[in-house]
Swiss-Prot record:
It comes from the Eukaryota. This is Spliceosome-associated protein CWC15 homolog. GO terms for molecular function: RNA binding. The lineage of its organism: Eukaryota, Metazoa, Chordata, Craniata, Vertebrata. Residues 24-34 have a biased composition (Polar residues). Residues 123-165 form a coiled coil. Identified in the spliceosome C complex. Component of the PRP19-CDC5L splicing complex composed of a core complex comprising a homotetramer of PRPF19, CDC5L, PLRG1 and BCAS2, and at least three less stably associated proteins CTNNBL1, CWC15 and HSPA8. Interacts directly with CTNNBL1 in the complex. Component of the minor spliceosome, which splices U12-type introns. The modification N-acetylthreonine is found at residue 2. GO terms for biological process: mRNA splicing, via spliceosome. The modification Phosphoserine is found at residue 121.
Length: 229
């Protein structure tokens, strides 16, 4: 049963605990991670390539020993391979041991002919692959040249269209088409309120007057007449 609910007859008082004789002194608390952990230097052991040990080693002798061990392992595996090869060769029937009834003109008589035939077939395959590769390269080069030519023709067409459409003297239409309109269009801000305010009153027309009110200005009236009414 818990004793958390029981009353405390002796409550804790400041300055009565351990190390709390002076209340003006701040309490200090340290964590285990704040304490120094590595207080001793670790040295290399005899098998960890210490400098003295490296100086005393004879690397050349160790290398020669490893090479001799590798040669011994290689020679140990060689008799087994030679025995396997000799047994496989001995299994092949000799030409003089084959009866005459089993001989056929289509059957290969020696392994050299088989090797020559395989080499010729390999050469033929290589030549065919090289020819196919050259064909593919040629087709790709032709396709690239065709695309470049089409791109140049398109760029030339666009350039000529820009030249003809940009020059009004060369852009004259025929008799069947409507005549070109060379009239200069007015700007959208020709009739705004605060345009050319720095000019004198004499430069302006007599029938126009300045009104510092956007609702009673001529521009607002024209706008309402044109778009609202």
């Amino acid at each position: 049963m818990t004793t958390a609910a029981r009353p405390t007859f002796e409550p804790a008082r400041g300055g009565r605990g351990k190390g709390e004789g002076d209340l003006s002194q701040l309490s200090k608390q340290y964590s285990s991670r704040d304490l120094p952990s590595h207080t001793k230097i670790k040295y290399r052991q005899t098998t960890q390539d210490a400098p003295e040990e490296v100086r005393n080693r004879d690397f050349r002798r160790e290398l020669e020993e490893r090479e001799r061990a590798a040669a011994r392992d290689k020679n140990r595996d060689r008799p087994t391979r030679e025995h396997t090869t000799s047994s496989s060769v001995s299994k092949k029937p000799r030409l003089d041991q084959i009866p005459a009834a089993n001989l056929d003109a289509d059957d290969p008589l020696t392994d050299e002919e088989d090797e020559d035939f395989e080499e010729e077939s390999d050469d033929d395959d290589t030549a065919a692959l090289l020819a196919e590769l050259e064909k593919i390269k040629k087709e790709r080069a032709e396709e690239q040249a065709r695309k470049e030519q089409e791109q140049k023709a398109e760029e030339e067409r666009i350039r000529m269209e820009n030249i003809l459409s940009g020059n009004p003297l060369l852009n004259l239409t025929g008799p069947s088409q409507p005549q070109a309109n060379f009239k200069v269009k007015r700007r959208w801000d020709d009739d705004v309120v605060f345009k050319n305010c720095a000019k004198g009153i004499d430069d302006q027309k007599k029938d126009k007057r300045f009104v510092n009110d956007t609702l009673r200005s001529e521009f607002h009236k024209k706008f309402m007449e044109k778009y609202i009414k």
